[in-house]
């Protein structure tokens, strides 16, 4: 772990970043954001990560900041879960608000993190509205479609369309509206991927219901529109990451647009992630490319997917070691009311890449 942190520090201090990744610098709020009261305007300048336009939004909407700090934490957690079985070492996200080249350039990985962050911000705000945590919003409006005979609209839906998207997009897109945030191509890429993330979030709205009736008969249901969990949204975006389109800038009329590099006759789809710079294979350690390599990464000997030793180890082979796990076992419930368990030891074999 110490070697990894030293290597990451070398990345941050020794490289000149080609593309500034200000669009997701706010993920650095996970470091000390929870310790700030967010009840005075000067708090908006206390921590690194917020660009001037986001600081202004913070000053006008201090009550949002607890949700945004939570969104930063959820984004990192979702990224960790989504890429734990991939060669790309998601740990570079921990260096926010400063990033290494794997996220500081317009890579496929940056496209995923940017879109996920945009989705999670709006998700966190919409949920906070429904939970009563924000004085400026409340539950979502009742759906306009007619309720079926077996249910009625009610409950408290996540306020996505009328508040979560509005405030989330204002926050996420603010850095990329400023020309000083980087080259236009990079800003166009981030704005596009932000929109993709929010579209996936909108598509995740689903009907959720609560049953009423004698002895749980569910003769009547009260239903509302709620968002799916972040893990589901992250999984959808990972699928888009795997099929992301490499793009190049092109002047079309008076507008500069991004078009697919390989199929320039086809416009970029509104629902596909795009990237500007091809990623390395992340097999070996390379500071200039932002690759930590896969040496000592755990792999699965029997799997066939990205977590398999064949793919994770890049053909270098793997080392095996045994680990003794101490677990609770043979648990019994006693009336009333406690559970007693024995302690068991189990030896498992682990594999790490050479």
Curated annotation (Swiss-Prot):
Gene Ontology BP annotations: camera-type eye development; canonical Wnt signaling pathway; cell fate commitment; cell migration; cell migration involved in gastrulation; cell-cell adhesion; central nervous system development; convergent extension
Family the entry assigns: Belongs to the Wnt family.
Pfam family, one: wnt
Residues the record marks as carrying a glycan: 32, 39, 89, 300
UniProt entry keywords in alphabetical sequence: Developmental protein, Disulfide bond, Extracellular matrix, Glycoprotein, Lipoprotein, Secreted, Signal, Wnt signaling pathway
PTM text: Palmitoleoylation is required for efficient binding to frizzled receptors. Depalmitoleoylation leads to Wnt signaling pathway inhibition.
CDD domains: Wnt_Wnt11 (cd19343)
Top-rank taxon, per record: Eukaryota
GO molecular function, one term: frizzled binding
Gene3D superfamilies attached to this UniProt entry: 3.30.2460.20
Location of the protein in the cell: Secreted, Extracellular space, Extracellular matrix
Main location per the UniProt record: secreted
Name of the gene: wnt11
Paired cysteines (S-S): 129-137, 139-156, 209-223, 211-218, 283-314, 299-309, 329-344, 331-341, 336-337
Entry-linked InterPro entries: Wnt, Wnt_C, Wnt_CS
Signal peptide positions on this chain: 1-23
Name of protein: Protein Wnt-11
GO CC annotations, alphabetized: cytoplasm; extracellular space; plasma membrane
Residues covalently joined to lipid (O-palmitoleoyl serine): 215
Cited function: Ligand for fzd5, a member of the G-protein coupled frizzled receptor family. Plays a role in early eye development, possibly through wnt non-canonical signaling. Promotes eye formation, at least partially, by antagonizing the Wnt/beta-catenin pathway. In addition, promotes coherence of eye field cells, potentially contributing to the coordinated morphogenetic behaviors of cells in the nascent eye field.
């Amino acid at each position: 772990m110490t070697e990894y942190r030293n290597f990451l520090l070398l990345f941050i201090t020794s490289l000149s970043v080609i593309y500034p990744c200000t669009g997701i610098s706010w993920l650095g709020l996970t470091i000390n954001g929870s310790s700030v009261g967010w009840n005075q305007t000067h708090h908006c300048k206390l921590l690194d990560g917020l660009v001037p336009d986001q600081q202004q939004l913070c000053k006008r909407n201090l009550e949002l900041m607890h949700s945004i700090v939570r969104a930063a934490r959820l984004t990192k957690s979702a990224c960790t879960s989504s890429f734990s079985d991939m060669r790309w070492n998601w740990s570079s996200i921990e260096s926010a608000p400063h990033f290494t080249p794997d996220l500081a350039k317009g890579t496929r990985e940056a496209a995923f993190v940017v879109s996920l962050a945009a989705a999670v911000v709006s998700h966190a705000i919409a949920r906070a509205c429904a939970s009563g945590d924000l004085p400026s919003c409340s539950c979502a409006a009742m759906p306009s479609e007619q309720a079926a005979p077996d249910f009625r609209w009610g409950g408290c839906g996540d306020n996505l369309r009328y508040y979560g998207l509005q405030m989330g997009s204002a926050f996420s897109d603010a850095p990329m509206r400023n020309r000083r945030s980087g080259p236009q191509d990079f800003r166009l890429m981030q704005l596009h991927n932000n929109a993709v993330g929010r579209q996936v979030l909108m598509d995740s709205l689903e009907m959720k219901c609560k049953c009423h009736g004698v002895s749980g008969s569910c003769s009547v249901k009260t239903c509302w529109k709620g968002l799916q969990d972040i893990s589901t949204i992250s999984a959808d975006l990972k699928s888009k990451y795997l099929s992301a389109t490499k793009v190049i800038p092109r002047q079309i009329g008076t507008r500069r647009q991004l078009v697919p590099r390989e199929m320039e006759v086809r416009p970029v789809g509104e629902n596909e992630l795009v990237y500007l710079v091809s990623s390395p294979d992340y097999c070996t350690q390379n500071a200039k490319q932002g690759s930590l390599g896969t040496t000592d990464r755990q792999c699965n000997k029997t799997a066939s997917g990205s977590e398999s030793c064949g793919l994770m180890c890049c053909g270098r082979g793997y080392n095996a070691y045994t680990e003794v796990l101490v677990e609770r076992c043979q648990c019994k419930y006693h009336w009333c009311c406690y559970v007693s368990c024995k302690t068991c030891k189990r030896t498992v074999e682990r594999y790490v890449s050479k």
